[in-house]
Structure formats: C-alpha cells, structure tokens
Amino acid sequence: MAYPMQLGFQDATSPIMEELLHFHDHTLMIVFLISSLVLYVISLMLTTKLTHTSTMDAQEVETIWTILPAIILILIALPSLRILYMMDEINNPSLTVKTMGHQWYWSYEYTDYEDLSFDSYMIPTSELKPGELRLLEVDNRVVLPMEMTIRMLVSSEDVLHSWAVPSLGLKTDAIPGRLNQTTLMSTRPGLYYGQCSEICGSNHSFMPIVLELVPLNYFEKWSASML
C-alpha cells in the first residue's frame, strides 16, 4: 500500500503490475535519453557561433530524424501492446466475483456460490480502531484466494465509477448498463487497498476497496462461514 511522502509506485503484488513497472522503467529511460539529446543540442545552439546559413538541404539529416523517431516509437509500442493483450487475456478463471458501484459504496457477489454477496461501506473515522487506516477501512473486506486467477465483473447501478487497486495493477470502469471484466492474481497474501477512481459525486472520496488475499484453505473456511 502507499505510505506518506511516497514518490514511486506501490509494491507490485501481481504479474501484471510487475510488467507495468518494467514497462514504465523502459519508457522512462527512452524519454530521459531523448530529453538529454534535446538539451544537448539546445545548449550547443546557444553557446556556439558556428552556423550553416548557406545550407539548402541535408537529406542525410532528414533521413535520420525520420527513421530514428520511428524506431523509438516501435521500441515503446511493442512492449506496450504485449502488456495490453496480457491484461485482456482471461484463461479459465478459478473464481468469478461481480462488483457493482453505488453512490457511495461497493457491493460484491461471488457468482460461483448460491448466496454469497454483501455490501462494503467505508468505516467512519469516529468508529476506527487503533491501527486502522483513515478513509480506507471497510466493514466487509473482499476475501480472495491467492495464486489463483480471479475474474472480476465490474458494473454500476447509478453513475460512472472506477474499481481500482494500484498494487495489483487494476483499474476498471464501472459503467451503468455495461459489464466490464478484468482478471487479478496475487503472488503473496496481504491486504490491498484501493479507491473509486472516477469522480461520482459528493462522497466519491469515501468509496474504499479492501482486498484480503489469503491461502486457499483459509478462503474455503471463510466462504463456508459466510453461507
């Protein structure tokens, strides 16, 4: 999860988020090299008195500044498309969970079970226990098994919402009348926090998301206790 004064990403806890972090570093290095080159050329133009006022054309230079940007764009586009297809791919999910956005809370339904659903509201600041996080704790956490492919179906009952958990690299829009889907898989147990990431009204800031990823045997015990 995030911590005060954090400047970077949250720790990756899913294969997709790890790929996104690698892509970010890859793209950032390319941007840094381009920026350095541009600054170097500008500094030369400002400090040197040498000019080429008689030059009418320079086909070699024009060829270079046409081909080089094309190569750079390819180096950015290929890994980006690879991750995009990875995020859209859904292979035999072990569990399906449907989440609906409301003003201003989330409801969850485990569709593989006959009667396992609940609403998840933010715990008010006045009711927090010592050690709990302000504006991030909920009365009902979403308990899921770790190291298993889970399909999330996301929609909304009223206005636009967005179901987002940064540590897992998830952000899926909740649109009324439309059912979007995404997959998640955590490589380690823990609590993962998120929030609604689409402005949806006066209490938009009070729609936290808490996922509790646990080993399979703990999930089975929890699901049995909820039925």
Curated annotation (Swiss-Prot):
Any idea of its EC number?
A: 7.1.1.9
Q: What does the record's cofactor remark say about binding?
A: Binds a dinuclear copper A center per subunit.
Chain ranges sitting on the Mitochondrial intermembrane side read 1-14, 88-227
For activity, the cofactor(s) needed are: Cu cation
Carrying Phosphotyrosine, the residues are 218
Which reaction equations make up its catalytic activity? 4 Fe(II)-[cytochrome c] + O2 + 8 H(+)(in) = 4 Fe(III)-[cytochrome c] + 2 H2O + 4 H(+)(out)
Q: Where in the cell is it found?
A: Mitochondrion inner membrane
Supply the InterPro entries for this chain. CcO_II, CcO_II-like_C, CcO_II_C, Copper_CuA, Cupredoxin, Cyt_c_oxidase_su2, Cyt_c_oxidase_su2_TM_dom, Cyt_c_oxidase_su2_TM_sf
| Key words, A-Z | Copper, Electron transport, Magnesium, Membrane, Metal-binding, Mitochondrion, Mitochondrion inner membrane, Phosphoprotein, Respiratory chain, Translocase, Transmembrane, Transmembrane helix, Transport
What family does this chain come from, according to its entry? Belongs to the cytochrome c oxidase subunit 2 family.
NCBIfam families xref list: CoxB
Complex and partners: Component of the cytochrome c oxidase (complex IV, CIV), a multisubunit enzyme composed of 14 subunits. The complex is composed of a catalytic core of 3 subunits MT-CO1, MT-CO2 and MT-CO3, encoded in the mitochondrial DNA, and 11 supernumerary subunits COX4I, COX5A, COX5B, COX6A, COX6B, COX6C, COX7A, COX7B, COX7C, COX8 and NDUFA4, which are encoded in the nuclear genome.
Protein name, as recorded: Cytochrome c oxidase subunit 2
Organism, per UniProt? Rusa unicolor
